């Protein structure tokens, strides 16, 4: 009697994750960084797909100054590289992923300008796409910095999954940009559309970074979105106690 052979395959093993983004702008190879073999993890989400479909209906004037904010792995930057956008992110990993994905398409080094959230944005922004971050403080910081560059003709879009878009999110766009509405959900993703209101140009000062002084005398400055911004966390406190002076 022949022996029975049982083959056990680990979950996800041998399955290639989806890396082909299909959008009205074309088809693009977009990969996560670091690389993953999990088939359910892509370098983009339904909100990226949604906003790219919407952008395809906007005047594709390449003379517009496009700005993309919080593009996790560069999917939007790659798809819109022909518009030579500025990509703003607070993540070094995001910037490295964007460079790697642009290189896959042999895009020129200057096809997308990469800036951090602390860098000065372009003086004029004609089209703005903001992927809504999980941290409301980061969104507020970013909108405050971007608002002076917007004008009445600017196209302003927010994009995110339904779990990241709340009433407080819409209120922030309304207060810092202008009249705001949201679209119906598609594959659990929504878009936010805002019309720039000149009255919001004077929305008040941006919230500054918080700071405090340690018992040892060091001054700690915490920018928006950093972990444990209000106080030093226990792990860091323990580490500092044992660092050589």
Locate each region found by the language model.
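Conserved class I S-adenosyl-L-methionine
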Residues: 61-73, 245
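A short acidic, Gly/Pro-enriched loop at the edge of an enzyme's catalytic core
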Residues: 118-127
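N-terminal auxiliary segments of SAM/dcSAM-dependent transferases
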Residues: 5, 12-22, 134-215
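Conserved SAM-binding loop
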Residues: 98-99
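SAM-dependent Rossmann-like transferase core, predominantly class I methyltransferases
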Residues: 34-58, 187-245
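Conserved SAM-binding strand-loop segment of SAM-dependent methyltransferases
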Residues: 107-117
């Amino acid at each position: 009697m022949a022996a029975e052979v049982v083959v056990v395959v680990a979950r996800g093993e041998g399955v290639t994750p989806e890396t082909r983004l299909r959008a009205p702008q074309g088809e693009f190879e977009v990969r996560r960084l670091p690389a993953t073999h999990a088939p359910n993890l892509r370098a983009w989400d339904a909100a990226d797909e949604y906003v790219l479909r919407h952008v395809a209906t906007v005047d594709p004037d390449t003379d517009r100054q496009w700005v993309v904010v919080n593009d996790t792995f560069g999917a939007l930057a790659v798809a819109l590289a022909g518009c030579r956008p500025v990509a703003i992110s607070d993540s070094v990993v995001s910037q490295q992923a964007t460079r790697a994905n642009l290189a896959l398409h042999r895009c020129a080094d200057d096809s997308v300008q990469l800036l951090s959230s602390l860098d000065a944005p372009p003086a004029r922004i004609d089209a703005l796409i903001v992927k809504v971050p999980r941290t409301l403080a980061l969104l507020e910081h970013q909108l405050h910095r971007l608002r002076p560059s917007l004008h009445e003709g600017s196209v302003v879009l927010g994009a995110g999954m339904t779990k990241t878009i709340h009433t407080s999110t819409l209120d922030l766009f309304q207060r810092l940009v202008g009249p705001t509405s949201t679209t119906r959900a598609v594959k659990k993703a929504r878009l936010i559309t805002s019309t720039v209101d000149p009255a919001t140009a004077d929305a008040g000062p941006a919230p500054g970074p918080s700071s405090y002084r340690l018992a040892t005398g060091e001054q700690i400055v915490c920018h928006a979105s950093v972990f444990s911004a209000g106080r030093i966390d226990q792990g860091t406190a323990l580490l500092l106690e044992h660092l050589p002076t």
